[in-house]
Amino acid sequence: MQKILYLHAGAEMYGADKVLLELIKGLEKDAFEAHVILPNDGVLVSALEKVGAKVKVIDYPILRRKYFNPKGILEYFGSYNRYSKQIAKYAKGNGITLIHNNTTAVLEGIYFKRKLKLPLIWHVHEIIVKPKAISDFINFLMGRYADTIVTVSNAVANHVKQSRFVKNDQVQVIYNGVDNAVYHEMDASAVRDQFGIAQDALVIGMVGRVNAWKGQGDFLEAVTPILKANPKAVAFLAGSAFEGEEWRVDDLEKAISDSPVAGQIKRIDYYSKTTELYNMFDIFVLPSTNPDPLPTVVLESMACGKPVIGYRHGGVCEMVKEGENGLLATPNQPAELSKAIQELADNTEKREQFGKASVKRQKELFSLQSYIRNFSELYKKY
């Protein structure tokens, strides 16, 4: 039996968190034993325990911007050494046979590769472009220490392979999958009532972390002319910020309140029943201003039968087939994004056609079953 130690960067329930949960939930319990160490407590802890994982919280450092200064570097490496020793003790005590680093922000897997001689799978959910020094540093570490670098899309794989530190045969693409038992089409009339949205309203929705690059600002700029022209249209945003970055939500709330169509814009924090939200939307929009590796929210909205609009970069280009299940705009061009939204806002038939194609494409290319099978086969190689 493979005893796998998963190292992850948080305990919330966003994209990479959900992907980890679904993987562990789907693994054969007689072939794999999942151990997860998280840097903090949160909703993910109990969710993982419910699917059979052994979970421990140890306050190990996650590579964040706050460490990108001389004082921060010293603080990071002091914590890194101290907590890595604790995790190594856990790994030895529990007979761990394989390490799965679930993000580039977690570097502790290197310690166990070096000290315990355990194979290391590095699961890359990010496309890190800036700062270039950090991108080069992480690629160097992955190239030197990872036995296999798993990327969530070809966009991520191509980015990683550009590094002189990474060998092509180190990299394997495994698409994330979503559970169609959870994400599926459903009647959303009660959800609209819950949020005070008319049944005949056109709802343009966005779900995503409020951070520097998910594109909430571009979303607001793009939907404003559409809301002005259609008093029955509603823009709906859902998502929270990282701890310590709550000011981003304050800025977003101010932008909404200052908008000339503020009465047609609704925003909520993280919402656990996202299936309800997707089904309430007529159009799903994710205008990430940096290349998004393979945004889980896009897959979830596709599974719920929604047309998708986004920017033409990153993994979205592999999820959305333009003119078939969605439309893409030139990155960081809100006016062009607005035209794409308007095209679907004006055409009910096209929205329905794209929505059906979204479900078909998600089931064919991004199924949960293929995601779990591909990882199981990789684990068995070690």
Please give the residue ranges for each predicted region.
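Acidic anion/phosphate-binding donor-loop and adjacent secondary structure
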Residues: 29, 158-163, 169-170, 177-194, ...
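Active-site donor-binding acidic/aromatic loop of nucleotide-activated sugar
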Residues: 244-249, 261-271, 277, 327-328
